[in-house]
Amino acid sequence: MRDLRARCEWDRVQTHQSLRPYLIEEAHEVDDAIAGGDDAVLRDELGDLLLQVLFHSVVAEERGAFGMHDVAGALVAKMHARHPHLYGDGIKRSWESMKAQKTKRSTLEEGLPAGLPSLHRAHRLQDRAAGVGFDWDNALGPLAKVREEIAEVAHHVDAETGAVHDQDALEAELGDLLFAVVNLCRKTGVHGALALDRTNAKFVRRYALMEQLAAADGKSLTTLSLDEQDTYWDRVKAAERAGESRGDGHTRES
């Protein structure tokens, strides 16, 4: 990387700020590779992500801030501090409680990236609160909270017409509902963002199959009524269930 910075004009002019989009993009591509289950692709994408780490380290080194050895050394020290039961005489404690003590956070959200996606942010906030004991005993607590929040959301939607009584209040209640769902995910060992990614992929897959079925009948979804579209949706779900019974495809999902 030092050689590239010296000899390549494009590499030479890059800064931490100009490299930000590439770092974010490479992280997403690693995530896609993991979801795809292809080890060769994952290997290549991890290399691209590592390149970004090296790039930022050399940029920092050039301005006398730190270098790659400093990055690696800080990581080793951090891992030792987080595992005192392995590398010291300390007892095993929760990751969040150790981080809070080490960094002496003054607020719950201190240190969380400003650009962290909302589902990830909710999960991390709840993890941090749990690290100091502010948490449900088990999944029954957040499950009851989800039911409570659904009722509060319904209070702002007219039961006859579906009209919204107070848009701002509804937004607040929907936020509470989403936060409760994330908490339920966390207490059951599911990451809300991954669960939603799975459902997004399922919806895209089923919608594409709907379009194919309609096209095979000489129709377009854009010209069909909702009832007709639902008929194709049900056909897709029935085909998936049939595929599951034969053991040749997707799992059964609603």
Could you say what each language-model-derived stretch is?
Residues 1-46, 51-174, 178-254:
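Flexible "arm" and connector segments at domain edges
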